[in-house]
């Protein structure tokens, strides 16, 4: 997250997003939450902006947004403010204007990223900040991906996503590649996606005899073969794809298109709806940008360094 327009009473925070380089669903907890094993990769684009201003209206939190159909009463920012003030008794009167640039319902973690930004701001401004361990615990209570955005570094996430192990980008063997993200005009609710997965698997946990905890040994592919797709390899998979693609067939078409354009891998991010491709050369993405622009489909690209 990046701070700008910083003053004693206001600031603007730019928040990035994430993609899942893989996503395995490894169990279901008694409370219905799902255990995962996933690689989270933070990205600077697309991004949101939070303009936070301290007011004198004794109103608690006032939230507004440039997207009209985003729910404000039940928003994750409201939840963040409520839980932090309850834990610390720090109740600043603030107004937040949220400028959405990250498509929501796209599996990019925009809401969790915004929550982490607000949580960081509250922590920095609180006269009685939480200890690091309590802050992480509160972040996980807000949302499973929020602890990751507090770190904002490549991580292997386990548990419900709150147990994080930092990973060097160089160890993933993807430095120098370009990530190209397609964000179709389609919103997929994460709870609905998990329900579809549960129904598809008849409450049985998906397992693979090829999958084990030594995942870090498998962050590579045969660079000598130009036709090799990363998606042929164990680690770049997403357990949501069979169920999501059966319901939203257009997403499987996007994946196939990315592979036809020369992607070394094409994978659904999170529970969707965004699909990304990994390309060896940055200039490969310019043709795709124009191709999808003509179809009024949002795309983003980022060189991984």
Swiss-Prot record:
Gene3D superfamilies: 3.30.230.10, GHMP kinase, C-terminal domain (3.30.70.890). It catalyses: 4-CDP-2-C-methyl-D-erythritol + ATP = 4-CDP-2-C-methyl-D-erythritol 2-phosphate + ADP + H(+). InterPro entries: GHMP_kinase_C_dom, GHMP_kinase_C_sf, GHMP_kinase_N_dom, IspE, Ribosomal_Su5_D2-typ_SF, Ribsml_uS5_D2-typ_fold_subgr. Pathway: Isoprenoid biosynthesis; isopentenyl diphosphate biosynthesis via DXP pathway; isopentenyl diphosphate from 1-deoxy-D-xylulose 5-phosphate: step 3/6. GO terms for biological process: isopentenyl diphosphate biosynthetic process, methylerythritol 4-phosphate pathway; terpenoid biosynthetic process. Pfam families: GHMP_kinases_C, GHMP_kinases_N. Catalyzes the phosphorylation of the position 2 hydroxy group of 4-diphosphocytidyl-2C-methyl-D-erythritol. This is 4-diphosphocytidyl-2-C-methyl-D-erythritol kinase.
């Amino acid at each position: 997250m990046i701070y700008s327009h910083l003053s004693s009473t206001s600031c603007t925070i730019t928040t990035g997003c994430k993609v899942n380089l893989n996503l395995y669903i490894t169990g279901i907890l008694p409370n219905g939450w799902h255990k995962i094993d996933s690689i989270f990769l933070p990205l600077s684009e697309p991004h949101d902006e939070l303009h936070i201003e301290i007011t004198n209206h004794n109103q608690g939190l006032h939230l507004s947004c440039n997207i009209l159909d985003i729910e404000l009463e039940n928003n994750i920012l409201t939840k963040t403010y409520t839980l932090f003030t309850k834990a610390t008794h720090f109740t600043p009167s603030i107004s937040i204007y949220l400028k959405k640039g990250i498509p929501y319902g796209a599996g990019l973690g925009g809401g969790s990223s915004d929550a982490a930004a607000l949580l960081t701001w509250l922590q920095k401004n609180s006269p009685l900040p939480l200890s690091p361990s309590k802050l992480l615990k509160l972040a996980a209570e807000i949302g499973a991906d929020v602890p990751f955005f507090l770190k904002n570094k490549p991580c292997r996430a386990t548990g419900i996503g709150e147990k994080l192990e930092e990973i060097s980008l160089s160890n993933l063997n993807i430095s120098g590649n370009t990530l190209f993200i397609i964000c179709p005009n389609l919103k997929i609710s994460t709870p609905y996606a998990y329900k579809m997965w549960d129904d598809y698997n008849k409450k049985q946990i998906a397992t693979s005899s090829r999958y084990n905890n030594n995942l870090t040994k498998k962050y590579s592919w045969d660079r000598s073969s130009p036709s090799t797709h990363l998606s042929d390899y164990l680690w770049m998979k997403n357990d949501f794809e069979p169920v999501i693609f059966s319901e939203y067939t257009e997403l499987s078409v996007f994946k196939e298109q990315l592979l036809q354009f020369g992607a070394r891998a094409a994978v659904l991010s999170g529970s969707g709806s965004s699909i990304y491709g990994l390309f060896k050369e940055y200039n490969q993405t310019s043709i795709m940008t124009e191709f999808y622009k003509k179809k009024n489909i949002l795309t983003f690209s980022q060189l991984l360094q």
